[in-house]
């Protein structure tokens, strides 16, 4: 297994994993996520694959997409009260449900940390849905800590 940038022939594997993530989110928040949802379709994925600010890394297990990490490079300059900084935002990280427990997620995460350092980023950030306890535990074990918390008041 090795980590590499995604290619167009990885799209079917990416879509299968996006559906797995969509189901996890749907199970946690059916009031927000649609049934059988996926974050990106084939057209969007083709566009993302050409965007150098949005790298997608895959864990390639003998040609099978065993996991992915969608990233967004962000630069903040002259942003009011905040310091200038560069960040890599993890938009989505998923390991195939049948391949979990093999350290694939850690390999992806560590690869992304190295990539972010190479790009001059000071931070790696992400969001986790409340209730996604396994993701919270994974990121906490990887050394991440909360920066901010999004609050909501449900009105209906």
Per-region residue spans from a language model:
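Conserved GNAT-fold acetyl-CoA-binding loop/helix
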Residues: 22-45
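Conserved beta-strand in the GNAT
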Residues: 58, 64-73, 89, 94
């Amino acid at each position: 297994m090795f980590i590499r940038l995604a290619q167009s022939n990885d799209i079917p594997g990416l879509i299968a994993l996006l559906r797995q993530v969509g189901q996890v989110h749907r199970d946690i928040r059916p009031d927000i996520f649609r049934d059988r949802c996926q974050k990106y379709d084939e057209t969007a994925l083709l566009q993302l694959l050409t965007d150098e600010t949005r790298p997608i890394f895959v864990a390639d297990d003998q040609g099978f997409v065993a996991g992915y990490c969608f990233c967004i490079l962000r630069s903040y300059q002259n942003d009011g009260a905040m310091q200038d900084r560069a960040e890599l935002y993890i938009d989505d990280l998923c390991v195939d449900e049948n391949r979990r427990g093999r350290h694939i997620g850690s390999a992806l995460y560590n690869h992304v940390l190295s990539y972010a350092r190479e790009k001059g980023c000071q931070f790696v950030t992400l969001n986790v849905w409340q209730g996604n306890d396994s993701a919270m535990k994974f990121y906490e074990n990887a050394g991440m800590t909360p920066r901010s918390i999004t609050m909501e008041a449900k009105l209906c």
